[in-house]
């Protein structure tokens, strides 16, 4: 069965050093991967819990929140692509033991993220009405969906900055940091969902707007934790002691090479999801709410 062996089609390279045993490689892989697995599962689980907590308002609320998801993901597609690129580049720089280059890449990505997010946020808040209408809103979901979308996109900068920093930490092998920030962020989100959706313990009853505010508050806490992680001396991307906010031309070119293909993949995937969501939304509010519940349950199955 050597016909399908990769050694037949790949150019052989001399071994640079001793290859670790398979048992050691498996142990190291699990050690790095398990925090990311838990993080991914909890993010999907919290999305499911969010749906349950909003459902007390009725099927219109589930549908309204669901309508905002794909427009939001299209808005942050560039940052999802950037996080893929920065994770890959920081991992390379760690292998090269080039901390200065890794920190400069991270700093530049944070700067670009803040500027781009500000622009996208303003556009989405200003044009929330036509965006949500295009996404397939109905008379009973439109107002709640617009309100939710405006709050979420108004505070999306905390999500994008956290996303970029956590991606860099994953690339540096610090997957536990990303896990902790997401766990705390999601727990804060759930607590404020309970306080603000139904108006418990003296808090105002804000409905879907309360769910959006809870999400933003959770993102603020998570973002603060991510920023704090860059000031830890144990972190490979410890930002003190490194000057400059602009990476080298070589690093910028590498970011674009990795990020461009990731962005194209993200944008087309999200457009496909949006078109599918619009099709389902046209069936009616109750049908779309059922679809949203099903999608949240399905996300648990591939969160690992």
Which positions does each model-derived feature cover?
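Helix-terminus/linker motif at the lipid-water interface of multi-pass membrane proteins
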Residues: 45-63, 132-139, 195-206, 267-300
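Acidic, glycine-rich loop-and-beta core segments that form the ion-binding/anion-interacting portion
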Residues: 235-293
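Short alpha-helical transmembrane segments in multi-pass integral membrane proteins
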Residues: 1-36, 90-157, 203-260
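Generic alpha-helical transmembrane segments of integral inner-membrane proteins
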Residues: 37, 41, 45, 49, ...
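Small-residue-rich hydrophobic transmembrane alpha-helices
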Residues: 62-122, 159-178, 291-304
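Signature of the first transmembrane helix
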Residues: 27-87, 257-280
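Hydrophobic residues within alpha-helical transmembrane segments
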Residues: 34, 38, 68-71, 111-115, ...
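Alpha-helical transmembrane segments of multi-pass membrane transporters/permeases
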Residues: 113, 168-195, 209-213
